[in-house]
Design a protein with these regions (language model features):
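Conserved helicase motor core of SF1/SF2 NTP-dependent helicases
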Residues: 2-94, 98-179
Length: 179
């Protein structure tokens, strides 16, 4: 999921369709918060964004990614710091969106500015919030499914490209959860 979103973002940047890529992700995983991690903001968010970096490095040379990060052409923007922004001429990705709250999701979605595209990526089976009912991804998919210019793509175990065994694992969990 993340790889596909990053591929589209990189292609859009390289084709001149956008001026910038903005990458965001909830900074809370399994109850941990950024404030408890050592370092400055970049050092705190980097571990959370590792899957996005991995995808970027597969599509662009390392030095090119680093240069675009340094020049803010690729921006890392923790969701906690998005309030008040309008993101224009950007390709915006929200990864691990299942771990946003309803309030965070609404705030994030309303950052969309002119000539921007937004891709929200998540998996409703991997919610780390205390209550799965609080997931902004689930809430948004219910509220926005019939709005023109907003689309949803759902993937399942047939779409897994990591390893054939991963598909079998997902299938086993899906069968176990349906019983």
């Amino acid at each position: 999921k993340t790889f596909l979103a990053v591929a589209k973002a990189v292609a859009s940047l390289q084709q001149g369709l956008v001026k910038k890529i903005v990458l965001s992700r909830p900074a809370v995983e399994a109850g941990e918060k950024l404030g408890f991690l050592p370092g400055d903001l970049k050092e705190k968010v980097d571990p959370f964004l590792r899957p996005i970096y991995d995808a970027l490095y597969e599509m662009m040379p390392y030095d090119q990614v680093e240069k675009k990060l340094a020049n803010n052409i690729i921006e890392i923007a923790p969701i906690a710091f998005m309030r008040g922004r309008t993101l224009e001429d950007c390709f915006i990705i929200l990864d691990e969106a299942q771990n946003t709250t309803k309030i965070q999701m609404k705030m994030f979605l309303t950052r969309l500015g002119k000539n921007s595209k937004m891709v929200v990526v998540g998996d409703n089976t991997q919610i780390d919030l205390i209550s799965k009912n609080d997931s902004g991804l689930i809430d948004a998919s219910k509220k926005l499914k019939n709005i023109q210019d907003i689309g949803f793509i759902e993937l399942d175990q047939r779409d897994v490209i990591r390893h054939e065994v991963v598909r079998k694992i997902i299938n086993a969990y899906d069968q176990k959860n349906s019983n």
